[in-house]
Amino acid sequence: MGRKWANIVAKKTAKDGATSKVYAKFGVEIYVAAKQGEPDPELNTALKFVIDRAKQAQVPKHVIDKAIDKAKGNTDETFVEGRYEGFGPNGSMIIVDTLTSNVNRTAANVRTAYGKNGGNMGASGSVSYLFDKKGVIVFAGDDADSVFEQLLEADVDVDDVEAEEGTITVYTAPTDLHKGIQALRDNGVEEFQVTELEMIPQSEVVLEGDDLETFEKLIDALESDDDVQKVYHNVADF
């Protein structure tokens, strides 16, 4: 599974790298985190977490600095979090998390993306109950047992630790993600491939042929919206 998460990040970074969308989305997220607390990552855990994720996605330093500088100013721009759940082809399920300054615009755009690309937006809660929220940490290593023991000693609520092809994947309770990252740093881990809060499907579906093509277009349409921050789904090997 570790390679799966690393591949997802690499795939998304490569796809988004052709545009500035990924930079803009992280810019908003960094701005909000800095505005809601101290604009100093050493004094603001949420801000430090977002900056670390931005660096994993290869967001340039000047983009990060610009967002923090904006938060230090007198701007009153307000962003609101949202979630939109829905369905794609052949049993596929999708959760879309947004961060927007215009909820009506975002809701209309997400609904249109679903409707025009073979999907159907559902009611709140129609999909999310079939997903589990977890912290996911991925880094280089091969001794899962040792990592598990280190996290337990640090009183981190760990769901699972997996080792695969030189990569360790740690699943934590969502509230213990930051604690898990710090515990691993304290034990010598210097670089992380993934540090994310994820919605993990309880079961996955396999799509092929036209269904897979339709699903890919739907995901691309959702992710291309400037207000969409994260898209989760239950399709295997995608």
From Swiss-Prot:
Q: Does the keyword Transcription apply?
A: yes
Disulfide bond residue pairs: none
Q: Which Pfam families is this protein grouped with?
A: TACO1_YebC_N, Transcrip_reg
Subcellular location(s): the record lists: Cytoplasm
Which stretch is the leader sequence?
Answer: none
Family statement: Belongs to the TACO1 family. YeeN subfamily.
Protein name per the record: Probable transcriptional regulatory protein SPy_0316/M5005_Spy0269
List the source organism: Streptococcus pyogenes serotype M1
What broad taxonomic lineage does this protein's source fall under?
Bacteria, Bacillati, Bacillota, Bacilli, Lactobacillales
